[in-house]
Amino acid sequence: LDNVVKPYPCGIVIHPLIDAAIALSPRVGDSGRIVRIAVDCHPLVVELTGNSAPRTGLQARFSAVHGIAAGLVDGQVGLPQYADARVTAADLTWLRGMIVLHVDERMPRDAVRIAVELDDGSQVVQAIDHARGSMARPMTTAEVREKVANLVEPVLPGRTEKLIRAVDALEQSNDVRELAEVVAR
């Protein structure tokens, strides 16, 4: 099976765009200086995630421009960036309006090129050849564990490490009791 672990809680075609936006975030600095954002992307990005004005967290999960805006402004993209209040926040709503998606038929599915034009006329560019979490660039064990911690800790506080150990132990044992105990408490 060709399975991967997704780093972001949204449509997978958005992942290279988010990678690029997060990489651009410290280089751009103040997002208020952005005049325009040009995105060269695979056709499926527009087809599947072309919602330019999401109003809810669910809609934003299928919005390429939301993923880019959140990555640029917040420097990270996780569940908090898909909360309804964050989706409708003025800074992200404004920035989404600056983003133009250009379909490039030659662009691989897990690649992107983003050019951010700033108010002084300068341009900051980031290309991603393979999205993090893709078959060509899978998440590391440490990244997967961090994702698990971010997802588990809010619902099973203080049990993240025990849960990870119990899952790791499954390879050596057919006994799932320890795992069941961790999640049942």
Segment roles from a protein language model:
Residues 1-185:
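Terminal-appendage/accessory-domain detector
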